[in-house]
């Protein structure tokens, strides 16, 4: 989470643009819907205890389509409140949320972000999503369903990934990985006492993804691994493709290369060719 001093006070013009952008909220057909869920969004409107949250987060993430999707999830009782952001990226913000059964992670994908145009290479060639529309909003919804299915497949393979619970338009609801205080830290942000052991475990995870799940993560790095109670969890599986994808091996080589580079930075000797061979057809770890 970025420090509070990275955020500047918005100028009056930007506030006026923000107001105009959300004028639709005052329309009668939407006002009742927004009134129903406004209390559940206090934490992401800068009115909760997390002071670094400001109106720009709301503007960037909570457009009409997203609010309608959240309203539907709240009507069904799947979500009670959206509490505060826990991660953000080019494609999505992730929020801690609360349900009747405890904390959740809610990943909201940006519906107006042009970066998705560069992600079609992870969809084109995936037989699970052939023949579907490539218009931007549909592309975002495809991406959400893709991450949902990839996480399901990885869990069936015995891997520790957040359990995907449901998706609605551009909103993905998942198991929250962390404790009552905070999400679990990324591998990037912790002190690794046994780099060789962690490397071997991650290589085994990568082998299970390839051999058992018939997938390539395609963005496997220290940024997308969480550490919880000494166990490693894989996250951000939206870009994962099947092993039948025409670029699957290219993505796998990239993943293995990143992992070996991480190991070397930590002082452990690792070679790409040997590591790649072990992922492709080496023995699998006991999970």
Question: Where are the language model's segments positioned?
Answer:
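Short acidic, glycine/proline-rich loop/turn micro-motifs
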Residues: 120, 184-189, 244-246
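Conserved ATP-binding subdomain of kinase catalytic cores across diverse folds
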Residues: 50, 57-183
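Residue-level detector of family-conserved "landmark" positions at structurally sensitive sites
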Residues: 84, 164, 219-220, 273
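A glycine-rich phosphate-binding loop feature that marks nucleotide/adenosyl-phosphate handling sites
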Residues: 170, 224, 278-280
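C-lobe/activation-segment region of protein kinase-like
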Residues: 2-3, 197-198, 210-217, 228-287
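Short, glycine/acidic-enriched loop or turn micro-motifs at the edges of active sites
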Residues: 110, 178, 222, 227, ...
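Juxta-kinase regulatory segment immediately upstream of eukaryotic protein kinase catalytic domains
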Residues: 7-84
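Conserved kinase catalytic-core helix
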Residues: 135-161, 167-168, 184-218, 223, ...
């Amino acid at each position: 989470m970025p420090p509070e001093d990275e955020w500047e006070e918005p100028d009056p013009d930007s506030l006026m643009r923000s107001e105009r952008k959300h004028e639709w909220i005052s329309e009668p057909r939407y006002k009742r819907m927004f009134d129903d869920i406004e209390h559940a969004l206090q934490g992401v409107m800068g009115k909760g205890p997390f002071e670094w949250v400001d109106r720009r987060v709301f503007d960037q993430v909570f457009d009409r389509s997203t609010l309608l999707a959240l309203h539907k999830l709240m009507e069904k009782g799947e979500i009670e409140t959206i509490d505060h952001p826990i991660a953000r990226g080019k494609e999505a913000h992730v929020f801690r949320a609360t349900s009747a059964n405890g904390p959740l992670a809610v990943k909201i994908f940006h519906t107006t972000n042009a970066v998705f145009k560069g992600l079609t290479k992870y969809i084109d060639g995936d037989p699970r999503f052939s023949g579907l529309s490539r218009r931007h909003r549909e592309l975002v919804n495809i991406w959400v369903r893709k991450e949902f299915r990839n996480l399901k497949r990885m869990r069936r393979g015995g891997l520790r990934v957040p359990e995907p619970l449901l998706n609605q338009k551009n909103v993905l609801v998942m198991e929250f990985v962390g404790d009552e205080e905070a999400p679990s830290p990324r591998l990037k942000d912790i002190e690794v006492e046994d780099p060789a052991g962690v490397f071997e475990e991650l290589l085994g995870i990568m082998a299970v993804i390839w051999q058992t799940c018939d997938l390539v993560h395609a963005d496997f790095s220290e940024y997308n691994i969480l550490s919880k109670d000494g166990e490693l969890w894989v996250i951000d599986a939206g870009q994962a493709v099947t092993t039948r994808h025409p670029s699957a091996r290219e993505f796998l080589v990239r993943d293995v290369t990143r992992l070996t580079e991480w190991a070397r930075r930590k002082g452990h000797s690792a070679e790409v060719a040997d590591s790649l061979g072990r992922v492709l057809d080496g023995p699998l770890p006991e999970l």
